[in-house]
Amino acid sequence: MERIKELRDLMSQSRTREILTKTTVDHMAIIKKYTSGRQEKNPALRMKWMMAMKYPITADKRIMEMIPERNEQGQMLWSKANDAGSDRVMVSPLAVTWWNRNGPTTSTVHYPKVYKTYFEKVERLKHGTFGPVHFRNQVKIRRRVDINPGHADLSAKEAQDVIMEVVFPNEVGARILTSESQLTITKEKKEELQDCKIAPLMVAYMLERELVRKTRFLPVAGGTSSVYIEVLHLTQGTCWEQMYTPGGEVRNDDVDQSLIIAARNIVRRATVSADPLASLLEMCHSTQIGGIRMVDILRQNPTEEQAVDICKAAMGLRISSSFSFGGFTFKRTSGSSVKKEEEVLTGNLQTLKIRVHEGYEEFTMVGRRATAILRKATRRLIQLIVSGRDEQSIAEAIIVAMVFSQEDCMIKAVRGDLNFVNRANQRLNPMHQLLRHFQKDAKLLFQNWGIEPIDNVMGMIGILPDMTPSTEMSLRGVRVSKMGVDEYSSTERVVVSIDRFLRVRDQRGNVLLSPEEVSETQGTEKLTITYSSSMMWEINGPESVLVNTYQWIIRNWETVKIQWSQDPTMLYNKMEFEPFQSLVPKAARGQYSGFVRTLFQQMRDVLGTFDTVQIIKLLPFAAAPPEQSRMQFSSLTVNVRGSGMRILVRGNSPVFNYNKATKRLTVLGKDAGALTEDPDEGTAGVESAVLRGFLILGKEDKRYGPALSINELSNLAKGEKANVLIGQGDVVLVMKRKRDSSILTDSQTATKRIRMAIN
């Protein structure tokens, strides 16, 4: 206050004002500072005093023909005096206004296309909803966030090639456009920007915004997707937050979100298959997200999430060197340790073999809703500083840190046996056993941990075993802080290896990730995820399995047909039939399979009894291990729509319906595709007749006249005999049965008798 008063007094004397306004600045150092170099030292000031002049702008001489000397108000727009040192004209800012209002117009069609990201941002803000402002302490942590909504995910190099090809197509230089997305974008942009008059450099900058993901390491409390980050300055201050709902979604956020869901589903499914790694790769390669191959997205998308990183590791891509435990990302910030196997006893006297980290280490722990700093020694937690959104989140972080510390009092707090299993029914490793146990109920853990009196430190308070805050006491070594812990900022990626059980290790052999770390949270993807792999058919329930199985057979009918006749065992073992087995009642699987395989064998033995529709219909049932039995079935049951539905062995049913006229198959009312029957099927060789109600008597008997064709055969009366031409030009004598008997026995005897008759 004193100094302000003093200054006021000085300013009231006219002499002071005169000195300040009239004295020239002739101190050499100051002149040097403001005049050396081309760089403007004080742009704001420069702009102010330039705009205060009458003609602060220079323009090409042609402007004198294009703009009148005075505007409608009679104000001068340009001066006849030349600009010193160039042959340009001095122009008033009013000339710009005149030009904007009355100057020539150009086509604006390209503006929304070039400045697409800006136009879209305006739309999002227009339709967004800003809610109330709340004043409260903001726990912000720095996270790496995507700052430019609506971009594709090209690498800088890929984008550069696309931009050069679109904006400067005639420039020299090798440009290789290889990826599908590069080619699509290039084609699209070239069409959009035909005859575009906007400066090429500007177009290039704008394209870069659209093609490349830009990330920054920013303090954030709340939403981290790019549509929230673009309004970060409006939604969170140091002590306030403003509620906001974006007025639109952008594809890049949708891709990130859908990628995480697809990766989680794939890892979960792979875990329960016979060879998890092979299955995972097969699924990643055959899945599309929003019409783009998942493997292409994985190569370009920097999202760090446990399931996504497992998929990346399987593809041989580098991932972040931090490791995951209990849903938190751990990054060691100092110290080191060696690992030793050690046997410990739980409170229930169960022996656990754990890998103990010997040595002093410090870690940052970052989760979705809580963060912490952890200092630990061998099997001892020294200090844990936690911050989180709420009591629940803080408790989660404390449990994970206590288990990670491997302290004896934690292991002794276990009551009951530890026998948690994963999706494939395998026991979890001891550390995850402990974690699951305490995540279910941590009361004893907190009570046994011990408490200590605390010093009053700014911004820190204690937390009691019942998770209530306190300023006097706290769980031993644990403090709650108002400040969050920043996420690990480095984008460094390391080479990792993955074993067939999807455990990811760094080059020193430390486990960074395992399927146990993959979140069980279910979400609905924003973009369509198309899993072509049969392993993922069951994700949408039994109906989807049924439809997909039949669609697969129809799509691959040409190969299936050959395998059916030449190598049926290989066909029955195809993994595409695996999901179908879950629909067949357990007790009937083996019997159905035995029955269908026998039926198929007869079709193969008796030439010409090939029946496309029937083979397709029954094929999935033949995949189960067969039981030899004399059982015959007229219908087979599948469990869909909450009950058993029947598939008729001969004929249509709501489950499996083939329309001969349209040649289309519907499964549960859904179209499953078009069938191409064999050309000779309608008039199938005589064997189908032999199969259905004829008895083979032996070799050709000339007394019964010339060999008949199949059509003539159908005119025989019961008990009548005839010679019939079969298969490879052989002729046999048959008799029409006196009664309609079992088709199956017919086919079995027919097979044997044809062989005998021919030989």
Curated annotation (Swiss-Prot):
Xref: Pfam families: Flu_PB2_1st (PF20947), Flu_PB2_2nd (PF20948), Flu_PB2_3rd (PF20949), Flu_PB2_4th (PF20950), Flu_PB2_5th (PF00604), Flu_PB2_6th (PF20951), Flu_PB2_7th (PF20952)
Cite a GO CC annotation: virion component
Per UniProt, which keywords does this protein have? Answer: Cap snatching, Eukaryotic host gene expression shutoff by virus, Eukaryotic host transcription shutoff by virus, Host gene expression shutoff by virus, Host nucleus, Host-virus interaction, Inhibition of host RNA polymerase II by virus, mRNA capping, mRNA processing, Viral transcription, Virion
The short motif Nuclear localization signal is annotated over: 736-739
Kindly give the InterPro entries that the UniProt entry links to this protein.
Answer: Flu_PB2_2nd, Flu_PB2_6th, Flu_PB2_C, Flu_PB2_CAP-bd, Flu_PB2_middle, Flu_PB2_N, INV_PB2, PB2_helical
Superkingdom is Viruses
- Leader sequence range is none
Q: Which family does it belong to?
A: Belongs to the influenza viruses PB2 family.
Quaternary structure?
A: Influenza RNA polymerase is composed of three subunits: PB1, PB2 and PA. Interacts (via N-terminus) with PB1 (via C-terminus). Interacts with nucleoprotein NP (via N-terminus).
Name of the protein: Polymerase basic protein 2
**Which organism was this protein described from?**
Influenza A virus (strain A/Teal/China/2978.1/2002 H5N1 genotype W)
